[in-house]
Amino acid sequence: MFKRLTIVLLLVVSGFSTALAFANNAEEKKLLRIFDEIWQYDMTRDPTYATYVGYPGQNGLWPDVSQAAVAADTEKRREFLAKLRKINRKRLGDDSLLDWQLVEKNLAGQVDSSEFPDQYILIHQRGGVQQGIAETLSMMPQRNRQDFQDQLTRLTNASAYIEQNIAMLREGLAKGITPPQITLRDVPQQIRNTIPEDVNQSPLLSSFTNFPDSISDDEEAALIAEAKRIITEQLYPAFNQLLVFMETDYIPNAASSIALSDMPDGTNWYNHRVKQFTTSSLTANEIHELGLSEVKRIRAEMDKVIADSGFEGSFSEFTHFLRTDKQFYMTSAEDLLRGYRD
């Protein structure tokens, strides 16, 4: 939800000064200033995303995932939503009104999401600090010495970030709020891959391999040596702490069920997710029934197409025929392009 809002705002505020100059009235200017305020806040709230979009000044930092920061963030988004809803929409042009609707919808969704403990779902096999730290370092700019100094600063701050993640994971575990155990199966090996015995093989060091010509060989060697020192003295112990916690406490006691509804207040949480991802007011059961009816309708239409074609055989035989008969395959790139165009 946060990423969707920042993408919307990126499109809106990327030409902020120009947009402000061409705003039709004071209300549209007020709206643009609110958008810019939200954007600036989001960039400081998530420094890793700020790095991703090229926002300056955040490259040495990590997000604050503490409970206090989560609560403060929710309150801030309530403030933004209240400001946004005070805008007189009757005075907005069509484009500005659409911008208002998109941002309002996303902010409202963020505030609604704060009723559920997503902040505890910080790690699984597809994401978490065991992958995210190295990934963030790899996408940082490498244009000059300051860029590499930012990487060193971010490396220095990473151990505290890992410890903060562990604290939140521990709190979530105590409350019975974890990802399904099966989604954590590969996490220990992912951690080990991040901290191999030979630090030169660590993905944490991979961003220190492509230096610009403006950095001398001596400076390059000094930067690499400092990176290795930080990684071995600070990050290796922090990741080992995470590894022990995952293997001895977290994974053995994580949720065995894959159903979100089995979590505390899970049914309401699941229904919220349904609304969030389908952007409809349909219930989970209504969506399930709709899916069944659509499958039945589509299958009936497919059976009719098979019957009308004159094919004699079962449905599975017909699909096998479609997959294997040469008449359904192009024999050249030109035929493929011609078939696409025609």
Language model feature labels by segment:
Residues M1-R4:
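Positively charged n-region of N-terminal signal peptides that target proteins for export
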Residues F22-D342:
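N-terminal maturation segment of proteins
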Residues T6-S17:
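Bacterial N-terminal signal peptides
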